[in-house]
Amino acid sequence: MALRTLASRKTLAAAALPLAAAAAARGVTTVALPDLPYDYGALEPAISGEIMRLHHQKHHATYVANYNKALEQLDAAVAKGDAPAIVHLQSAIKFNGGGHVNHSIFWNNLKPISEGGGDPPHAKLGWAIDEDFGSFEALVKKMSAEGAALQGSGWVWLALDKEAKKLSVETTANQDPLVTKGANLVPLLGIDVWEHAYYLQYKNVRPDYLSNIWKVMNWKYAGEVYENATA
């Protein structure tokens, strides 16, 4: 891990400590920005190091800070019995909490090519994909098409419906987490189609980003989530 990357993360973590400590004292559970399991430049050329650094240090860090702030405000509003404030804070909690949840999944969905990123799924997940979509290639085509067609900002997901015991492709708007589409849906893969995920490298050509991100997809992680969810 580059020293600059580590230093930046330590600074972010230190800045979050006073808020987290104050929240913990009152029993409020805050969240922290997770470290990435690879260096910012490790996904090049599919995703540039600059995009990964900004995406993690700025965008995800902001969701974490704003979510924790909203939790603090909610805690105070509940203590006062301030119903209008409690209702008002729900949108900030959903948006920023969803941003944290979604990005935490997204980082694990990616892996450097040198470490197996882009290797197709095998075993149970591979068989399930063939059964539910016809082929791995058909799934990639479907997810890429739905991600490209999504208006505005959002996410495209490969989900497991635990009740139906089938895989499905879902989209969510803005930072809505997959659970908003159904409590029975387990996210196996999530692709961020907000412009901040690709614009510095791919400009306004979202399909090119969606074509290249498969080269660094961590199917091993997705397979592990699938096997745990179906055990």
Swiss-Prot record:
Q: Kindly list the places in or outside the cell where this protein is found, as annotated in its UniProt entry.
A: Mitochondrion matrix
Q: Does the keyword Transit peptide apply?
A: yes
Q: Which InterPro entries does the UniProt entry name for this protein?
A: Fe/Mn_Superoxide_Dismutase, Mn/Fe_SOD, Mn/Fe_SOD_BS, Mn/Fe_SOD_C, Mn/Fe_SOD_N, Mn/Fe_SOD_N_sf, SOD_C_sf
Which key words are in the record? Manganese, Metal-binding, Mitochondrion, Oxidoreductase, Transit peptide
Please give the catalytic activity noted in the UniProt record. 2 superoxide + 2 H(+) = H2O2 + O2
- Kindly state what the record says about how the cofactor is bound: Binds 1 Mn(2+) ion per subunit.
Record's keyword annotation contains Heme: no
Which Gene Ontology molecular function entries are recorded, alphabetically? manganese ion binding; superoxide dismutase activity
Q: What GO terms fall under cellular component here?
A: mitochondrial matrix; mitochondrion
Q: What PROSITE patterns does the entry give?
A: SOD_MN
- Residue span of the annotated presequence: 1-27
Q: SUPFAM superfamilies this protein is in?
A: Fe,Mn superoxide dismutase (SOD), C-terminal domain (SSF54719), Fe,Mn superoxide dismutase (SOD), N-terminal domain (SSF46609)
Instruction: Supply the Pfam families for this chain.
Output: Sod_Fe_C, Sod_Fe_N
Q: Which coarse location class applies to the principal site listed for this UniProt protein?
A: mitochondrion
The record's subunit annotation is: Homotetramer.
Q: Which family would the database say this protein is a member of?
A: Belongs to the iron/manganese superoxide dismutase family.
What function does the entry list? Destroys superoxide anion radicals which are normally produced within the cells and which are toxic to biological systems.
PANTHER family, from UniProt? Answer: SUPEROXIDE DISMUTASE 2, SUPEROXIDE DISMUTASE [MN], MITOCHONDRIAL
> What is the protein's given name?
Superoxide dismutase [Mn], mitochondrial
Q: What is the lineage of its organism?
A: Eukaryota, Viridiplantae, Streptophyta, Embryophyta, Tracheophyta
